[in-house]
Amino acid sequence: MTFVKKSADKTPIVDNVFSIVSKAKQDKQQNGSENVIDATIGSLYGEDEQLVALDEVFNHYDAIDHRTKAAYASSFSGNPDYRKAVYEWVKQDADVKLAHSVIATPGGSGAVSMSIETFLDAGDTLIIPDIAWGNYALMASVNNIDVERYHMFEEDHFNLCSVKETIQKVMLKQDHICMIINDPCHNPTGYSLTKEEWKELIAFLNEVSKTHSVVLLNDIAYIDYSYQLSTSRDYMETFNDISDNVMIVVEFSCSKALTSYGLRCGGAVILAQKEEAVREAEIFMEKKARATWSNIPNAAMSNFVWIVTEGKDPYMKEKQKYIDLMKKRSEIFLEEADQVGLAHYPYKEGFFVTLKMKDNVYRDAFHKALMAAHIYTVAVNKGIRVAVCSLPVAKVYGLAEKMKEIERSLN
């Protein structure tokens, strides 16, 4: 006898990231933090190996009236000023001319999961990269949605050919397409598409839309740590070229932008050529929000609005220090990796660098050997994720060489 619904996946969840983080923590306690390289943590850490909580974010949050913190949001779709601020923040200087709306969500995870449930039925197929944040597949699975994966890379660039082949395969079995592009600052490789790659992608989606409706979910969780921050939104201008039968939902997260991982604040920005198309998606998302989380934290929304308006300049200045720090860390690691011949996927910017693995059997052996040497990383599909977002500079130096030595010992 069972009590859960018949369609439920009863396989216990295994979160590989948290289990490895726990092993690294235990090793530090036993052998001393100075003897352990912990490149697992996917949050921004300072050189003191402590979580960064931006002063310009939390000093104002602490000053918010307790009643504001205690109160419900004014709407389950989000406070009006917050929804407006999210749209303006997401697009910034990009000249986006599409009809739009914003639904407030508990973080970027809430935005992505709500979008998947909005556009796909049980038995449908979601298209995602073969190297990706593991939660995409889990979000699909809990809704009995299948997953088809495109190959992320062809040599050192985005594999548009694989995207096309994967979409064409899915087109044979359903009359609508829903796919995820995590860009810029892809998790876990640090790749960012060029504007030309975006143009080619949009052009192809327009071709697909002649026979199938298309929804593109653009997960921008890490965009506010782009190394080219002033031009990080330029690619969004390619969205203006979408056909009437294409919709884009930009999935925004305050977790990284405001170092507010636990406040659960984000939004789904719906974009389409026609207002009625946006409204149709908005109606379902409003109901989904009301039925699932009711509303998101009122004070988190209030804080975001203040930061991106009155508090913007000092916030941007403080955050830039950590962007520069992460850039320094990644440059050191990549330079040394290239010197010793440690293969990695094409990295441009972001929280993570991912080493190339020929297959997952070899990856697992390498991952185990790294841990035996007190080096903790996260195994991803055909890769080993190195979190430069949390690794202090002193521990970045020499890491690539240590990894290469371990690789040689396996070969």
PLM region descriptions:
Residues 85, 104, 241-323:
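Conserved core segment of the aminotransferase class I/II
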Residues 1-10:
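Generic N-terminal amphipathic, Lys/Arg-enriched alpha-helix
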Residues 41, 305, 319-337, 342-356, ...:
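Conserved glycine-rich beta-strand-loop-beta hairpin in the small C-terminal domain of fold type I
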Residues 68-212, 223-242, 394:
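Conserved core of the PLP fold type I
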Residues 219-220:
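Walker B catalytic acidic pair
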Residues 10-107, 410:
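N-terminal small-domain helix-loop-helix segment of the aminotransferase-like
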Residues 13-23, 54-57, 163-165, 195-204, ...:
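Well-ordered, non-membrane alpha-helical segments in soluble/globular domains
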Residues 88, 92, 96, 168, ...:
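PLP-dependent enzyme catalytic core of the Aspartate aminotransferase-like
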